[in-house]
């Protein structure tokens, strides 16, 4: 009887424990006037392969995209020079591996060839409940918070990671 009660409590705790996944937003202001500007050609020519790499990476869950598999069509600022990327990952390690240990890192290193400086922070990370996906409004609020107030459990970066709730 005691063992059954113990096992029941363990199973109940597992059911009550909320699972979390990592959301990220990355915002960039292009050097070009818009995504079709010739200065952006090389960057744009690699978007499909970089996005495919993300989608095939361990830990990848979801990314913001339209019906044509395009993320550059979203424009929450009503500014053609700004592009956003929002995605969801299983954990910090998965996103960090994709970002810095695959050919994606080449684009991080070459960022200044295509993009201007964007505020104090151009990306933000935060934890969301499993099976939930961030809206552009929510993601922008997280980034704005990080820019204005710095890292916290509400929004953080790779240098100051907050653990899952």
Regions found by a protein language model. Name each.
Residues 2-82, 121-165:
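Short S/T/G/P-rich N-terminal loop/turn motif that feeds into the first structured element of a domain
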Residues 46-50, 84, 94, 107-110:
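Short, hydrophobic/aromatic alpha-helical segments in well-folded domains
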Residues 62, 88-89, 114-115:
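Tryptophan-centric aromatic hotspots in well-structured domains and transmembrane helices
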Residues 75-100:
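Helix-adjacent hinge/juxtasegments
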Residues 92-120:
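An amphipathic, aromatic/His-enriched active-site/gating alpha helix that lines ligand/cofactor pockets
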């Amino acid at each position: 009887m005691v063992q059954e009660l113990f096992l029941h409590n363990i199973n109940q705790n597992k059911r009550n424990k909320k699972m979390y996944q990592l959301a990220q937003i990355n915002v960039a202001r292009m050097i070009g006037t818009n995504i079709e500007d010739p200065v952006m050609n090389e960057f744009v020519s690699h978007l499909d392969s970089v996005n495919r790499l993300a989608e095939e990476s361990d830990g990848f869950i979801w990314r913001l995209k339209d019906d044509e598999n395009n993320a550059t069509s979203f424009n929450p600022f009503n500014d053609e020079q700004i592009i956003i990327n929002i995605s969801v990952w299983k954990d910090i390690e998965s996103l960090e591996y994709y970002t810095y240990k695959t050919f994606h890192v080449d684009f991080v290193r070459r960022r200044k060839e295509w993009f201007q400086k964007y505020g104090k922070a151009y990306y933000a990370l935060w934890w969301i409940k499993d099976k939930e996906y961030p809206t552009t409004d929510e993601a922008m609020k997280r980034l704005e918070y990080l820019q204005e107030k710095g890292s916290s459990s509400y929004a953080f970066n790779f240098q100051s990671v907050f653990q899952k709730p």
